[in-house]
């Protein structure tokens, strides 16, 4: 009887284990999400500095076995990671390879139907055969995350770390096809340059180094962190302090012009002498002349000078929500001449999110060449600094309508944004972009969906959102750098 109970118990455990695996692969219901709205939509070690796995962009492979392919290469690179010392103490430094996931547009289902792993390879390493294989794949919605979908490659991909390492330096090729007439790759990956957001998982699914790969992105991102130092001399060499003078714009000097009129009043006193022509009685009249002096007090009546405050009224037309005082923080320098980072609108496209209309907004974040050439390091010393944060003075009614963002051309994906608790300010934080990455330029993309707002014009009405940029690490410089609409 006890044996029967044990058999039943083991059977139940097997069923539960199988169900758990299915849930992990499809809906990830068993994974505790720290941020359920952020790719890769699960709790795992996603920082690239803790794993050597990278997905390097290779390019197109046309008409191979009846398909046109876009190919990448799985490589191991420890540059800028904690995986450079032996023995390896970090568990993700020597993790096995299990699957790759891409963050894709839900409405592009049917765009990718095949995945090819290990193209052109047939080799046995340590008793493990590595062989080209083509399998069927598809795009799956992410449970509980509206407007999110995943393209997953699992079949025939699993390999031990030692086998993956034996294919250095070229790595292991992985390709996906594209069905003619479907979404383009920029549409599929929701990036104008076709940059893909990816995660590489181990079999325990607790390691998921996450990054970007595309024609304009070097997936081995941590290394450039030291590169911003060289550019620093360039901006300082051509610094142009004159930029600060424009900032003072006190029109107050005009009021003094009224002061000259007071001198003319003194001439009136000469007329009083004619009255003295009469006999002694006139002397008493001279006291009346003192009343004329009262006109002189009129000059002190500069209280009319308060008229100068009238100039402030023109400021309101700057933008629908007045951005007076923005950004609301203390910085060493607020001058755009001290910090060359700029933000512009790259593109805005219509999207459907959970059956409702919305828009995807991509902002170009970069170091402006002209601003860098004339940057004045004497105003705060931020000319060669990286970018930590971007703030938008926006429509506060859009709180709850912004979905997490993706950031291209960086070593990691970050999706940290928030609204100020008391003011209508949308903040994109923890960007961690280096100066060198700013020179290359990057895209910050996010979705806008109801209920409060569904369009970029809702978020940035009128003349648009006023933008402020902050250097890292201590927000020394925080200039306003224009508006976007």
Swiss-Prot record:
Residue ranges, compositional bias (Pro residues): 221-234, 241-317
Matches recorded under Pfam families: DUF3707
Name by which UniProt lists this protein: Sulfated surface glycoprotein 185
Region ranges (Disordered): 212-317
Positions annotated as glycosylated: 193, 347
Keyword Transport tagged: no
Keyword Manganese tagged: no
InterPro entries: Pherophorin
Subunit description: Polymer.
Annotated function: The extracellular matrix (ECM) of Volvox contains insoluble fibrous layers that surround individual cells at a distance to form contiguous cellular compartments. SSG 185 is the monomeric precursor of this substructure (C3Z structure).
Signal peptide: 1-20
Protein keywords: Glycoprotein, Hydroxylation, Signal
Description of post-translational modifications: Intersubunit cross-links are formed between saccharide chains rather than between polypeptide chains.
């Amino acid at each position: 009887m006890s044996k029967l109970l044990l058999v039943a118990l083991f059977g139940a455990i097997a069923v539960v284990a199988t169900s758990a695996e299915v849930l992990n692969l499809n809906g990830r219901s068993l994974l505790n999400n720290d941020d359920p709205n952020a790719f890769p939509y699960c709790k795992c070690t996603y920082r690239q500095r803790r794993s050597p796995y990278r997905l390097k962009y290779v390019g197109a492979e046309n008409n191979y076995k009846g398909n046109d392919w876009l190919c990448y290469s799985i490589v191991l690179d420890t540059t800028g990671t904690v995986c450079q010392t032996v023995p390896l103490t970090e568990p993700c430094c020597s993790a096995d390879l299990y699957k790759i996931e891409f963050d894709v547009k839900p409405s592009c289902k049917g765009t990718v139907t095949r995945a090819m792993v290990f193209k052109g390879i047939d080799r046995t390493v340590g008793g493990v055969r590595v062989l080209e294989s083509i399998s069927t794949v598809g795009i799956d919605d992410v449970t509980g995350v509206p407007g999110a979908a995943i393209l997953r490659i699992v079949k025939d991909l699993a390999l031990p770390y030692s086998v993956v390492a034996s294919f250095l330096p070229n790595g292991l090729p992985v390709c996906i096809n594209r069905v003619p007439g479907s979404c383009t790759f920029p549409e599929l990956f929701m990036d104008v340059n076709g940059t893909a957001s990816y995660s590489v998982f181990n079999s325990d699914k607790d390691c998921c180094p996450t990054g970007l790969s595309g024609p304009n992105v070097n997936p081995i991102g941590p290394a450039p962190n030291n590169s911003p130092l060289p550019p620093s001399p360039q901006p300082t060499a051509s610094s142009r302090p004159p930029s600060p003078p424009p900032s003072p714009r006190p029109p107050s000097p005009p009021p003094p012009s009224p002061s000259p009129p007071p001198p003319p009043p003194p001439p009136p006193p000469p007329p009083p002498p004619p009255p003295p022509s009469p006999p002694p009685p006139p002397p008493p009249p001279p006291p009346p002349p003192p009343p004329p002096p009262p006109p002189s007090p009129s000059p002190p009546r500069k209280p009319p000078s308060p008229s100068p405050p009238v100039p402030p009224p023109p400021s309101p037309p700057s933008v629908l929500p007045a951005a007076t005082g923005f950004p609301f923080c203390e910085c060493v320098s607020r001058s755009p001449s001290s910090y060359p980072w700029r933000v512009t609108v790259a593109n805005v496209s219509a999207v459907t999110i959970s059956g409702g209309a919305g828009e995807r907004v991509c902002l170009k974040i970069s170091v402006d060449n002209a601003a860098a050439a004339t940057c004045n390091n004497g105003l705060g010393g931020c000319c060669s600094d990286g970018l930590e944060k971007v703030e938008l003075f926006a429509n506060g009614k859009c709180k709850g309508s912004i979905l997490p963002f993706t950031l291209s051309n960086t070593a990691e994906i970050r999706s940290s944004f928030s609204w100020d608790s008391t003011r209508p300010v949308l903040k994109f934080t923890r960007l961690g972009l280096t100066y060198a990455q700013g020179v290359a330029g990057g895209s910050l993309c996010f979705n806008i969906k109801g209920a409060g707002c569904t369009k970029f014009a809702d978020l940035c009405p009128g003349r648009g959102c006023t933008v402020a940029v902050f250097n890292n690490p201590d927000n020394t410089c925080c200039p306003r750098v224009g508006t976007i609409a």
